[in-house]
Amino acid sequence: RQYSGFTSAKESNERYRYLLDQGVSGLSVAFDLPTQIGYDSDHLMAEGEVGKVGVPISSINDMERLFDDIPLDQVSTSMTINATAATLLALYIVTAERKNISIEKLRGTVQNDILKEYIARGTYIYPPEESMRLITDIFAFCSDHVPKWNTISISGYHIREAGSTAAQELAFTISNGIAYVQAAIDKGLKVDVFGKQLSFFFNAHNDFLTEIAKFRAARRLWAIIMKNRFKATNDKAMICRFHTQTGGSTLTAQQVDNNITRTTIQALSAVLGGTQSLHTNAFDEALALPTDHSAKLALRTQQIIAHESGVTQFTDPMGGSEVIEKLTSDLEDEAMSIIEKIDAMGGPISAIETGWVQNEIAKSAYAYQKSIDSEKTKIVGVNAYVDDGEPEPVLQEIDQASVRKQIEGVKAVKKNRDNHTVKTKLLQLETHAKSEKNLMPAIIDCVRAECTLGEIADVFRKQFGEFRQT
């Protein structure tokens, strides 16, 4: 499953169909920054960012173009989206409806993990309590209507990218997972039902053996917590199902071809650690969005591991190794100690609001960078075996004509739709937001009426307010 999206829905659709032809087993959608933080492509705040790091999606028209000629009942789609996850899921559902596909057949994932946004990434909009409401509304709606959908991907990836250690990535991710499970239970959901649809997202970093042990420790920890803390009895609700992406922060702008080797080693650690799905970064992603060539090479890397290495023939092939077992137990113990410390603070939301989690990550990031600067940690091509004469790589460029076309398209949607119906549906959404009703049906109604992502986000901005880090 290769993470991809850029410039426009049309061009991203072409990349998805290319990847499907090359053998990917599912799609993984990258959205641009305005989409992630609830702005339409024609908004002043979106200027300079449209299509830059992912695909811009403002309306149902964009979503239909993104999945043109892709059978949504046959392909699993992962969407890396958080603050606006409810709206993107609604757009996907309405796209399926327009293709005459039953939403009960839809398979995929929304990342929907807002806590790690406050910790590490920053694409939050609303305060934590209101964000948790949107998350649990997705849990409840999908449990009833989209049963094959994974409603959250509890993410350590970005926590590691922000500079955490392996143990901190594990602890902060599992702690956030505890908060989500408790919120779902408080909403009246049954742990043995929604627990089966939870998934995780981890980082595969440079230290090969530590990463294998980290994945094994995650599986142990989650099973123990679901069984002992939340009294789950269904084995499937105790499984730590996880996706892995190779570490983007480990890619270097210098000697970019070296990144192929880094990514291969990281991908192998994820497979040996038991990952259910995998994204291998393209070697040029330290500099730009991947080209067709680099994206294909990244895909071939994991296909060679899957089909030629032989490691996928065995469950937990590193189990029993004295080194791996000790590393696994040490990471499990260290992570549990951190989780208990967070529990004593009142849980992850309290720990986030005081800034404790962010400060712990910052300290680890500083220590790691110091070790590179002092050359204690060797990075080939950066502080060791430096080559000043390397050629410039060929990079993917953003097509500004496509960006202008995207902006014009959003303006055309707003001009040509039934704006009386749009206004009515947005007012109904605002009324729902003031109540305790599940917001998903009202969001879906807005999408059917061609309300845009930014307009829906603005309703919630007005009702919920915006979060500001202190």
Predicted regions and their residues:
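Structured ligand/cofactor/substrate-binding pocket environments in proteins
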Residues: 80-90, 127-133, 171-176, 206-224, ...
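Flexible, glycine-rich loop/tail regions that form catalytic "lids" or insertion modules at the edges
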Residues: 292, 300-303, 307-470
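Flexible glycine/proline-rich, aromatic-decorated loop/lid segments
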Residues: 190-194, 232-246, 254-281, 290-315, ...
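Short, glycine-/Ser/Thr-/acidic-enriched flexible segments
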Residues: 5-8, 32-34, 84, 115, ...
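Generic beta-strand/beta-sheet core signal
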Residues: 1-3, 29-32, 78-82, 109-111, ...
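Phosphate/diphosphate-binding loops
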Residues: 58-61, 76, 81-84, 96-98, ...
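Catalytic alpha/beta active-site cores
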Residues: 1-205, 210, 229, 236-243, ...
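Conserved, mostly hydrophobic/aromatic
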Residues: 23, 59, 100, 222, ...
